[in-house]
Swiss-Prot record:
The Helicase C-terminal domain, residue ranges: 367-532
Gene Ontology MF: a single term: DNA binding
Function: DNA-dependent ATPase that acts as a 5' to 3' translocase on single-stranded DNA and thereby plays a role in transcription termination of viral early genes. Uses forward translocation in concert with the viral RNA polymerase RAP94/OPG109 subunit and the capping enzyme/VTF to catalyze release of UUUUUNU-containing nascent RNA from the elongation complex. In addition, acts as a positive elongation factor to assist transcription through problematic sequences.
Protein name: Nucleoside triphosphatase I
Motif (DEXH box): 141-144
SMART domains attached to this UniProt entry: DEXDc, HELICc
GO (cellular component) term, any one: virion component
UniProt entry keywords in alphabetical sequence: ATP-binding, DNA-binding, Hydrolase, Late protein, Nucleotide-binding, Transcription, Virion
Residue positions binding ATP: H55, E56, T57, G58, V59, G60, K61, T62
Subcellular location: Virion
Length: 631
């Protein structure tokens, strides 16, 4: 049915031929062609009630949305605009962009942050105040967070945000309102998020059905056929976060480096104690204590079970202060720092004070030592992602930075009042090479909504639970024209994943999380392909054989058809002759996978999904006694 969708897209574009490509307020900006295209379609089809902007970080989805909001009155007189956003993103980018390019809509805007404990009450209170003659346009920024907060908990409890989700899914189309969802990573943790998002945009279209069988989509064609026009898809980098990507005129080159570091004996000792503590307390599935132990360890492991919280907190504070005091008036000499900046380690002729300090710091954290050495050897500015703030996280890392003489800013929950200004200073043209501020260390607070310019190295100290979060992190530094001020030879970003290892070869929590991420991505890649093939851009570019229409009366019927996956049309069982193989998508063998090569030369993954044909002259490497095909 994509031909039918193409006819409506064509109709919308014909209706909006004269829509200006510039947006003017106190400043003027000219929209990119892809921004103007999606705005014209969404505004040109009044009965297109909802749309997902699946745009990668840095391509201007906020700007696109503000342009749409500015032109809502081209199709109806009275609008109330409700923006559901994270609190940290209200001022920048949303308010700043609106005031700069569309100040006239400010009076119509209602901002509600969905991470507020009273979000549900505030939302419905505001809904009641809206004039009945007004149409509503709802914007959900970083909609994957909103969806996550709307999922029913494993224990069956319904989250407060779910009532807002239900209201929007029932009301938007019924009352002729409009809704735009924005995300660079619309699916983060589970396939259920895809179902939730689809039913928010197209209510009732995807009932409780199993989307996958043996990790393969049951009927991709049915999904694509029924969900045409669901989204706008602007994703220039479709590679895995673990793949290298060549640079272009607008985007910096990305190179991924896996930095494996062997934990010190002290760290291994504390790591094993952390593992036992997780088992005793029943939190081993979260791996929090082990993740912290791979990052930094005090001289002892503070037990938390069956203890007064105040007493436990006091012990942590004492351990922190003891470590901080041990570094008082200590720092590396200029000679040592010059050695580190060359990418070298201390030699035998180094001072006893430098060697002693380095040894003490490494015993407690090989990761922090590795990061500091990497930063000093970097030719430009650096980002460091550390999800933990207190105890063994950023608070400790900053002590290491001080000893190594690394200038820095912090973007975390501890710096809410100063972090936006600090990032602005970090991004200044005068700091392009990191002369004033070398590094920004950020927690999960910095994973969304902010931009960094002229970054050359990103160090990821702790694996997240999903690839989407890693994309958000890396996407902060590789954005459209983010390196325009950087010298041509430094328009690159090295992404360093720092992975801790045990001396006995057993997998660590870092390696466990790496495997979890790869397992999830197999299903997500297929769902992202559905988004791509149902997008306005894909349909407009690939469906040309349609009969033009002169009204939009059939759009609602077209997009209201239920999806039926019961027939499982594309699931076929077939026995194929061939041989088992090992393959990797990286020349550096960052991940090695089991696969299968049929006698016809077709290559499949371990679940039977076709990957591609075997090249005539494949690249093969030998690793641990295995022949590894490089694809």
């Amino acid at each position: 049915m994509s031909k039918s969708h193409a006819a409506y897209i064509d109709y919308a574009l014909r209706r909006t031929t004269n829509m200006p490509v510039e947006m003017m307020g106190s400043d003027v900006v000219r929209l990119k062609d892809y921004q103007h295209f999606v705005a014209r379609v969404f505004l040109g089809l009044d009965s297109m009630h909802s749309l997902l902007l699946f745009h990668e970080t840095g391509v201007g989805k906020t700007m696109t949305t503000v342009y749409i909001l500015k032109h809502l009155k081209d199709i109806y007189t009275n609008w109330a605009i409700i923006l559901l956003v994270k609190k940290a993103l209200i001022e920048d980018p949303w308010m700043n962009t609106i005031l700069r390019y569309a100040p006239e809509i400010t009076k119509d805007c209602i901002f509600i942050n969905y991470d507020d404990q009273n979000f549900r009450n505030k939302f419905f209170t505001n809904i009641k105040t809206i004039n009945s003659k007004s149409r509503i346009c709802v914007i959900i920024d970083e909609c994957h967070n909103f969806i996550s907060k709307s999922l029913i908990k494993e224990d069956g409890k319904i989250r407060p945000t779910r009532s807002v989700y239900n209201f929007l899914s029932k009301t938007i189309a019924l009352k002729n309102h409009k809704m735009i969802c924005l995300s660079a990573t619309p699916i983060v943790n589970s396939v259920q998020e895809f179902t939730m998002l689809v039913n928010l945009l197209r209510p009732g279209s995807l009932q409780h059905q199993s989307l996958f069988e043996n990790k393969r989509l049951v009927d991709e064609k049915e999904l694509v056929s029924k969900l045409g026009g669901l989204c706008s898809y602007i994703v220039n980098n479709e590679f895995s976060i673990f793949d290298d990507v060549e640079g272009s005129a607008s985007f910096a080159k990305k190179t991924v480096l896996m930095r494996y570091v062997n934990m010190s004996k002290k760290q291994e000792e504390i790591y094993q104690k952390a593992k036992l503590a997780e088992i005793k307390t029943g939190i081993s599935s979260f791996r929090i204590l082990r993740r912290m132990a791979t990052t930094f360890t005090f001289d002892s492991f503070p037990e938390r079970q069956n203890r007064d919280p105040g007493e436990y907190a006091q012990e942590i504070a004492t351990l922190y202060n003891d470590f901080k005091n041990s570094l008082r008036n200590r720092e590396f000499s200029k000679s040592a720092l010059d050695t580190f900046k060359k990418g070298e380690l201390l030699k035998g002729d180094a001072s006893a004070a430098d060697i002693s300090l380095f040894t003490e710091l490494k015993e407690k954290s090989v990761k922090f030592i590795d990061v500091c050495l990497g930063i000093l050897a970097s030719h430009g500015k650096c980002l460091v992602f550390e999800p933990f703030v207190n105890q063994s996280g950023i608070e400790i890392l900053l002590l290491y930075f001080k000893v190594f003489g690394i200038s820095n800013i912090e973007f975390s929950s501890r710096t809410k009042d100063t972090r936006i200004k600090a990032v602005a200073e970090f991004n200044q043209e005068s700091n392009t090479n990191g002369e004033c501020i070398k590094t920004c260390v950020f927690s999960s607070s910095g994973g969304e909504g902010i931009s960094f310019f002229s970054i050359n190295d990103i160090f990821i100290l702790d694996m997240t639970w999903n690839e989407a979060s890693l994309r958000q992190i890396v996407g902060r530094a590789i954005r459209l024209n983010s390196h325009v001020l950087t010298p041509p030879e430094r328009r690159y970003v090295n992404v360093h994943f720092i992975m801790a290892r045990l001396s006995n070869g057993m997998p660590t929590v870092d390696e466990d999380l790496f495997e979890i991420i790869q397992s999830k991505s197999k299903e997500f890649v297929q769902l992202f392909r559905v988004f791509k093939h149902t997008s306005l851009e894909w349909i407009h570019a690939n469906e040309k054989d349609f009969s033009p229409i002169d009204n939009e009366s059939g759009w609602k019927t077209l997009v209201s058809r239920a999806i039926d996956l019961s027939s499982k049309k594309n699931i076929t069982n077939k026995l194929i002759e061939g041989t088992n193989i090992w393959y990797s998508n990286s020349n550096r063998l960052m991940s090695i996978n089991r696969g299968f090569k049929g006698v016809d030369g077709r290559v499949y993954d371990v679940d039977g999904n076709y990957l591609h044909d075997m090249p005539d002259n494949p690249v093969i490497k030998i690793h641990d006694g295995k022949l590894i095909y490089i694809f």
